[in-house]
Amino acid sequence: MQNTILIHAPGRRQGRGALVLAYTALFALLMGIWAAIFALNGQSFIQYGDTLKQHYPFLVYYGRWLRQAARCVLTGAAMPTWDFSIGYGADIITTLSYYGLGDPLDLLAAFVPGRWTEQLLEGLIVLRLYLAGLAFMAFSRRHGNSRFGTLLGALAYVFSAWPIQAGLIEPVFLVPMYCFPLMLLGADDLFEGRSPVLYIAAIALTALSNFLFFYMAAVLLVLYAIAVYSKRYGAKNLRTLPPLLAKFIGFALVGIAISAVTLLPTAQELFGSARFGLTRETAPYPFYRFFELLANMTTGMGYDAYSTYAGVTSATFLGVLVLFAKPRQNTVLKCAWLGLLALLLVPQAGSVLNGISYVSNRWVWAFTMLEAFILARVCPGITAFEPKEKRNLFALLAVYCVVAFCVKQGRTETALLGALLLVLLAVFVLAADGVSRRGVQAVLLAGCCLGVVMNLGGYYGIEEADAVNEYRPAGYAWSTTVQDNPAVTLHLMEDQSYWRYDSLVNEPINSPMLLDVYGTGYFFSLNNSYLSSLFRELGQNTPVEYDYRGLQNRTPLETLFGVKYALCAPDSTGALPALFDSQAVQAAEIGGSTVAVYPNTAALPIGYTAQNQISRETYDALTPLQKQDALLDGVVLEETGLLPEAELTGDTVSPAAEMELDGVQQLDETTYYAPQDGGRITLTIAQPVADCETAFVVQGMQYTATSPLDAMNEEELSAMSAHDRRSLQKQYAHFWRKDSVYLRLLSNIGEGRIEYNRPNSQYYCGRHDFVYNFGTSDEPLQQITIVLPFAGCYQFDRLAVECQKLDTVAARAENLGAENLQNVTLGTNSLGGEITTTRSSVLVVQLPYSTGWSVTVDGTPAQVLRADTAFLGVALEPGSHTVAFTYKTPGLTAGAALSAAGVVLLAAIWAVPALRKKSKKRRK
């Protein structure tokens, strides 16, 4: 049995309890060491980045939402699927499904108060890791691996680089670690002719928990099934393929149907998101990456921009070397390891397995599972070598050490320590002929545990990578997002109408959803595509469209988006947008600092009317600042002829500027070449415009990196010393891989920065137009210098300074808001109110458009219009009207029906065989 793989081995129940007990004890020990590292440094498992900004707010909110949903079920009320406090308003299911809205484990949030969600999040991380080990052991034992080998493999898998580096930052990344082994076990059941219940349940669990990892797991499951089928039947028994294929596909569809309640709505939203379907560039990996990857096989390190956390422990990688040292054994495993390693080295594979999106090896948990399985497989005979096999192992070890450390990127202290432990363990197994089985097991177990501790210390230790510094103390998450959040001040306001606020203080992103206030920030992976389009049209200086904070003090936008108040420190009122009153209407002491609330004197109400429309053709021809100006004169509609054409009365000018180049060559009308880092383009305005809001506008930006060495002639290179020449060559060896660039702006009224992500960046969202708002100042902008920090070709369709007079903004806003929605009620998935209009008009409601919205006017269904690219609209005739918008998640009804049907089918599949068996017994 040891010479085969992927063949079901029945009867492996012996010692199951002892194995689980041993695993539990060792897991507790190693997890305790992990936790102790954090405790000794005064930190929790809450990382300052994505954990605090996305996963923690999700879990707090989800617990509250579940409790509300339970009350709705008990009272017969409608369940909320739309929330006005998520960004500018968002669908709850599609926004949060990526973070575990369908994950059964996250249902525990319903029983935990928000204040204790931090502890729940930490507990779920530990629980998921523990379950990953149990799932791995079940799979390993099913395939005939020894108990001790399975134990070692489980520890190696659970404490590999993937959970160490990614599992705490993105807790949802741990989901496939326990779901995927269950999917493989279910597939084994189908091959063995057993019940498909586990297969269906595992697919449903994975798809419910996270749609992206379900996609990855499904692709890898197909590869696994091909390998198993080839091993079992080969090419000579293809007649068995159709019935097997029918079973695999049919039962998989049942599992997918069960998950459809979240999967179907999310898929519909995903296909329309800003990140989906973009044309991206996929650059080859640098040559040294192969060596760096090998060097870090024995560590918890090896960070790169592609999430390639492939490290395990020295003992585990020794298992891989032993596997290859023994010829004519475990051929399928060898092919699998080489195949997956090849995929890690091909960027296109990272793109395909990441949902045909940007390059990311987030499937690397499957590679570490394979390595852990290899360790479990070779463990029983790890000291039994033929002379030739010993020579093979020694040669492989030597080649590994030479290859892995031949480049500097691999010669880290942690990698060298991992290699040293690998060599020591290899020497032991080569010389352990006379050592007892218990002795060998003790050394291997100690080596495995020591490797885990070394990896934890190397990554989190303050003397090493010091990753623990990225985490925050216990209680920090609740304090910063809720208890001491500056937005708590808004709860003291007496204004009970619907309004948004902007923030000029340090407020955690996504925290408004925890306080039930309506902000202007958002950071979740899926976002409203129409809102993204509007921001793109307006040139918002946010290169990542699903991560935005505020409206960058652009006065017309603050008005158009209904921002009625701003949070600001009393000593920083000079930073307020132009039409905000400097007299605070509310103030409070929050977290040791004073926070005040300042009103916008020109904010539009949530529902206002436009009597004129701007055609899409006219609107698209405007510059970003002209667009925001035009929206104060009418409404942009996709339909034509509903309203008279608007007369654009705004006053946005672009003063003529003289361009001066320093270290930059203009190749053509739009292309500028900076041969060296730090080139400058200076625009000098002969007739500056005063008393306005001033912005710098970039349109059609693109960037192609070049090496500064290419611009140096032979004479310049020869004048340099050999050392300096090699240093420059090394510095710019991978210039072509640059995936982002920024423009540094220097002017007489302030400094700024515009960031641009190239198509080869994982953060690329198709943005090429940007506006940097300098705001208003006592003096006009006279000169601005654009610093090009890196050598390369910069393409700008347009570089300009634009100045917008604000004299008429308040009056035009007052005209739009003269006939507005009154007695506004925000209900569950609904917004309604009353309005009286004197002319034919379009009611614009500042909520993101979605096909899930419907509207009635005076009880009669009407067409929901897409207004101003991203908002809701409805046409109204003169008179008094009652308007009611209602939201239903697109695809939710169909998804729920499919889920119900899937559950019924699963129950039937489970029950029918049992009933038949019972019936047969009765007949006998």
Residue ranges and their predicted role:
Residues 7, 11-13, 654-924:
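Active-site-proximal, structured, solvent-exposed surfaces of multi-pass membrane proteins
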Residues 1-38, 243, 247, 430-446, ...:
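Start-transfer (signal-anchor) and selected internal transmembrane alpha helices
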Residues 105-109, 517-629, 633-663, 692, ...:
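A cross-kingdom signal targeting lumenal/periplasmic-facing segments of multi-pass membrane
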Residues 30-133, 155-177, 270-275, 282-309, ...:
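Membrane-interface coil-to-helix junctions
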Residues 86-88, 94-98, 450-476, 490-561, ...:
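Extracytoplasmic/lumenal acceptor-recognition loop(s) of multi-pass membrane glycoenzymes
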Residues 27, 129-143, 147-232, 244-267, ...:
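Membrane-embedded helix bundles of polyisoprenyl
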Residues 194, 213, 335-348, 352-481, ...:
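Contiguous transmembrane helix-bundle modules in multi-pass membrane proteins
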Residues 53-54, 60-72, 97, 104, ...:
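Periplasmic/ER-lumenal interhelical loops and adjacent helix-loop junctions
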